[in-house]
A protein has these predicted regions:
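Acidic, glycine-rich two-metal-ion catalytic cores of nucleic acid-processing enzymes
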Residues: 1-101, 160-223, 237-246
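Catalytic palm active-site di-aspartate
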Residues: 60-63, 111, 120-123, 215-229, ...
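Short alpha-helical scaffolding segments that buttress acidic/His motifs in well-ordered protein cores
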Residues: 71, 107-115, 147, 191, ...
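Short, well-ordered loop/turn and helix-capping segments at boundaries between secondary-structure elements
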Residues: 72-80, 116-120, 129, 149, ...
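Generic alpha-helical secondary structure
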Residues: 120, 136, 140, 154, ...
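Catalytic palm subdomain of template-directed nucleic-acid polymerases
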Residues: 121-131, 224-240
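Short, basic interhelical loop/turn and adjoining N-cap
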Residues: 127-142
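Polymerase palm active-site segment centered on the conserved acidic dipeptide of motif C
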Residues: 147-159, 231-271
Length: 271
């Protein structure tokens, strides 16, 4: 409440916060500031402060597991769609946990750490926070190797991305060039950029088909928030879910893209 980006200090006379959204990051993923709405805690006491205009209803949606779906898309070339099938019809984290020999909770943490380019130390600590740095590095290296072995086609995908990134760039889902700082970040950049491209296409398709009373409130990474009159709520929710699927189809993804839309009076009720 006292910092430069304190919400009340950034609140306008219209009782709104107009945050800044940039798409100029290295991975073309959206970045948020003044304030960073992506860092608003998920707790109800914080999210309920963000409300719909009186007489309007908030409608919002998140892309469902977009990072894992992008991984499934790129793996399909090497695993024949196995990862995508388990992701959609089974429990991918439990399958990997059984293969690696760690808990489902730990393998889920390891999965996202791996996808976001974490080093061996961080991966080791994600399994056991009590480890020393050296032991965490050794444990992380072991878990990383087991994780790669557990997922059919992942080793081949990593090698292909590493080879392509040797030139300094890789291509995103829409063909744009992504400049890669180092080869070990290449897969992370590929998945993050392609997920961002899907999110923006989702936003575009939704915007082109909005119900008469609807207008946008926020775009935060893989989340869209709108408000509309009560009579347009169901149409808007349907549109958000349909547009997500169409965004994936637009780029001929090897796995369907999905979103779950909710409505309510505050951000706490729709996210």
């Amino acid at each position: 409440s006292e910092g430069v980006n304190a919400w009340l200090k950034l609140c306008t006379t219209s009782s709104r916060i107009h945050h800044h959204c940039s798409v100029s990051t290295n991975t073309f993923r959206a970045a948020h500031r003044k304030p960073n709405l992506a860092q608003v805690p998920a707790d109800e006491e914080f999210r309920k402060l963000f409300t719909a205009t009186p007489g309007m209803v908030m409608c919002g949606a998140d892309l469902s597991g977009i990072e894992l779906r992008m991984l499934a898309h790129y793996l399909a070339r090497y695993d024949g769609g196995r990862y995508a099938d388990i992701l959609l019809n089974g429990d991918i984290h439990q399958v990997n946990a059984d293969k690696i020999g760690i808990s489902r909770r730990d393998v889920k943490t390891v999965t996202y750490a791996f996808l976001y380019g974490a080093g061996d130390v961080k991966i080791g600590l994600s399994v056991d926070k009590q480890l020393s740095t050296d032991k965490a590095r050794a444990r992380g290296k072991q878990v990383r190797a087991a994780f790669i072995e557990a997922i059919d086609g992942l080793s081949e995908l990593l090698q292909a991305v590493k080879k392509r990134s040797a030139s300094g760039t890789i291509l995103a889902i829409d063909g744009r060039k992504i400049f890669v700082e180092s080869q070990h970040k290449a897969l992370n950049y590929l998945l993050q950029c392609s997920a961002g491209v899907i999110a923006k296409r989702w936003l575009h398709i939704t915007h082109e088909n909005l119900p008469p009373t609807a207008h946008q409130l926020a775009f935060v990474h893989d989340e869209l928030q709108y408000e509309c009159k009560e009579e347009d709520v169901e149409d808007l929710k349907f549109l958000l879910e349909l547009s997500a699927a169409q965004a994936g189809e637009y780029y001929s993804l090897r796995i369907p893209i999905a979103a779950e839309a909710k409505s309510g009076a505050t951000w706490a009720e729709v996210h």
